Amino acid sequence: IRRQRQMCIRDSGICIAGYPVTNYASNVILRFLRFRMGNKECVHPDGADALGGKGARNVIIDHCSISWCTDECASFYENDDFTMQWCIISESLRLGGHTKGPHGYGGIWGGEHSSYHHNLLAHHDSRNPRFGLGAKVRKNGECDGDYVDFRNNVIYNWGMNSSYGGERMNINIVNNYYKPGPATVTGSKRGRIFAIDATENRSGGYLWGKYYIDGNVVDGGADDKNSQKATANNWEYGVYNQFSNNYKKVVTQKTKDSIRLDKPHEFASVTTHSAFNAYKQVLDYAGCSLHRDDVDARIVKE
């Protein structure tokens, strides 16, 4: 974009709207920007993310507000050394024109040595997030790539599904705050921290990832037994109790022991709060918060 004269941006800053934004460039920082795509101008709603990117290295997404997509609001995978922090990812368009029908999804998150912390995911049917492995081939079925650290995030008002996926990935899920809302389904999914998936190998068995999960809180209110149990015992009720029917007959105690880690995967240090403190910090500071607009203010209030 070549301008012929000086441009002054006043008040609330920059909002990019109308079409998807995709980053394939390395050594990039995006900070204090809004991405509110919508479905009025985008002519190809399938695969249209408000903000996404893959195949890059050394990328930071910081204090951005991302919403109103027709596929996922924010999907980042197949990146190396990636950080998404202090962002608000909200209100995917469930009926935005995707050819598969209802499609209000938060994002697919992955990458090698990727950190996702202090983000707010609000009002998505599913993929809050969906942890997704990149296309790189894994030797001998071992988990030798895609190390993801997911901590101090707030997940609010998921519909049918909160976090899931993670096939053959190495993931820390630490001190996150899950809060069911009006759209959240009843039953055990109200206590869902993470529904683990696996990859089927050629011999008919399954290849699992390695996960460290601790300190997560599910706040469903005083009368919600599912969320209370998941908070008290993250693994038993927030994870083991969340396997899909496809796996329930094949998940043995040996499987459970093999996927559960007693120590977290090593990552660069991130200032880590308790789940309760993270909830307050994220609501106070996440998103394009130097000048918080009416959309983000409403999401936070809700």
Where are these regions (language model features)?
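Long, contiguous C-terminal flanking segments immediately downstream of a protein's structured core
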Residues: R2-R3, G18, Y178-E302
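Extracellular beta-strand-rich solenoid/capping regions of secreted or surface-exposed proteins
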Residues: R2-R3, I14-F32, M37-R57
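Short, small-residue-biased leader/transition segments that mark boundaries at the very start
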Residues: Q4-I9
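Right-handed parallel beta-helix
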Residues: R10, S26-N39, G55-W68, D80-H98, ...
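Structural detector of coil-to-beta-strand junctions
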Residues: P20, A50, E72-C73, L95-G96, ...
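Extracytoplasmic/secreted cell-surface and envelope-processing proteins
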Residues: N39-H44, T70, R138-K139, T186-G187, ...
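Short, surface-exposed recognition loops or helix-turn segments adjacent to catalytic cores
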Residues: P45-G47, D71, S75-N79, T99-P102
